[in-house]
Amino acid sequence: MLLRFRSKIGMNRVSCEATDLFGDVVENWVKEVGLNVDPGTVVVGNDPGSAKEPVSNIAGRSVEEMGLKHGDIVYIEYSDSSGSNEGQSVPVNAVGAGSAVISELPVDVLLEKEDGLIKRTRSSLCKHGDKGMCEYCSPLPPWDKEYHAENKLKHISFHSYLKKLNEATNKKSSGSSYIPPLSQPDYKINKRCNNGHEPWPRGICSKCQPSAITLQQQEFRMVDHVEIQQSDLINQFIESWRATGMQRFGYLYGSYEKYDSTPLGVKAVVHAIYEPPQHDEQDGLTMDLEQVEEEMQKVDQIAMSMGLLRVGLIFSDLTDTGNGNGTVFCKRHKDSFFLSSLEIIMAAKHQLAFPNASRFSEQGKFSSKFVTCVVSGNLDSEIDITSYQVSIEAEALVDAKMISGSTHPSMAYINETNEEVYVPEIFYMKTNEYGLTVKENAKPAFPVDYLLVSLTHGFITEDSKNQIKFHSTGGFPWANRQAMGLSQDYQELKNYLYSAATGGDYNLLHEKISNFHLLLYIKSLEIFNEKDWSLLITSAISENWEQPLIQLTTTESFNSLVLIMEMI
């Protein structure tokens, strides 16, 4: 149905459903006409001059409950907002709430302050003194193509890309207002188009339908490197496959930090792996998504108290060669695939679920820093890790439900247009047999390589500034490993911790409690109050752990834990 809104700027039509909340309809009207509205002043009425009902009072009622029908006129009055909200639409539902503050990651705040210039020394072409500078030795911008080609860097970093766009979009010589250089692509058809026609699938126009899409390999990457704090972390993860022959899936917990090996680079530092409930098989696995999501929300909250974020996912794809020497088949290479179409879609859904906050984007978010790691066989038949992200175009295609998996893992199938989804023309650029770049129609399927962004990976180095957060990765069973005959219970807790908790060796006790899975289990017992829990976390992961640990052993919570172990 269409509602007509009469205001001081004229008549405007807004498409809606009878079940839509009236507050949402008014908010869509604000967005469509691009108004600068003070939400506290918006009032509506049925007749000219009768607009006295504040929208905030009726925002929670549906259009049907308001008695509005197709074609009805709503008279609306408002005052223009001013100040810091200029040029931005404000949600009318959130009366009294200030404009949203975008909370960026600390690493983004840090890198935004740096220029990232690539310094160069004097060369033989320089004709000046030590204090001079010329075109042969002046610093290069962080996105310089020749520098990246010489150093074999396939992608520029996100912040290099951002500075490149910002320099082109907001030139210093221009006196115009600031324009956000980033915009999250949206390939979905606009079902609220107010261009005088019924919504899709009963009507369509050039304004509401998405434009043709041309896929290109992404030149930047949100994360440049994945750093795993301990090699034993991966060994513990693949121990499940070694014991059962079944594949395994887990989430990576860690943080994002500055990466010095590329200009303005970012790395995901992995401190722990958590395996959600799953049914493993030789060629895949099955999960109850609702159960997994419920459990992971709890783990996320506990991990946050340790200063950790869910930074990615990891899964295995291993098949033993049968030679008895620990070798595995190499399944993923340039002549087969690196990530299958189904895995691309899975990665895109996770990236959409973990958006990257950015104040330089029109939407306040841009792509994601969530990474995908695969443990599989390399060309030497050794167990190895590869790390990826999918492009921002992949995120938009999956969000718009335009692609699905195919029987060929290296190809993504393009869905047909239906009542819910409008699929425009999709093309991709390729080099033909004559070495020329040509545009190909992507339907019915196209190579998933156009959606893939490869990352580097490695383990912590001796000179790394990062402190190892958890000193123990094994000893205490990981969660959800009942298929291996392992479970987290009081007996396992006693076997792992009791002697250290009562022996008086604080170094040993620190090493034992510095275990991600032990801490999660202790939290689930609900023995520790908030104060003692904070003390336990400090004792487990802090550099200066001695005094907090001594204090911890005197608390009622810790002594209750020891008492429980004694009773087993």
From Swiss-Prot:
Localization (cell): Cytoplasm, Perinuclear region; Endoplasmic reticulum membrane; Nucleus membrane
User: Where along the sequence do coiled-coil regions lie?
Assistant: none
Q: Which GO terms describe its molecular function?
A: ubiquitin binding; ubiquitin protein ligase binding
A single GO BP? ubiquitin-dependent protein catabolic process
Which coarse location class applies to the principal site listed for this UniProt protein? cytoplasm
What keywords sit in the KW lines?
A: Cytoplasm, Endoplasmic reticulum, Membrane, mRNA transport, Nucleus, Protein transport, Translocation, Transport
Boundaries of every MPN domain copy: 226-366
Protein topology in the membrane: Peripheral membrane protein
Intrachain S-S bonds: none
Q: Which InterPro entries match?
A: MPN (IPR037518), Npl4 (IPR016563), NPL4_C (IPR007717), NPL4_Zn-bd_put (IPR007716), Ubiquitin-like_domsf (IPR029071)
Record's Gene Ontology CC terms?
Answer: endoplasmic reticulum membrane; nuclear membrane; perinuclear region of cytoplasm
Q: Which Pfam families match?
A: NPL4 (PF05021), zf-NPL4 (PF05020)
Q: The organism sits in which domain of life? A: Eukaryota
Family, according to the entry, reads as follows: Belongs to the NPL4 family.
> What is this protein for, i.e. what is its function?
Involved in the import of nuclear-targeted proteins into the nucleus and the export of poly(A) RNA out of the nucleus. Has a role in the endoplasmic reticulum-associated degradation (ERAD) pathway.
What protein name does the entry list?
A: Nuclear protein localization protein 4
State the species of origin.
Vanderwaltozyma polyspora (strain ATCC 22028 / DSM 70294 / BCRC 21397 / CBS 2163 / NBRC 10782 / NRRL Y-8283 / UCD 57-17)
Q: Which gene encodes it?
A: NPL4
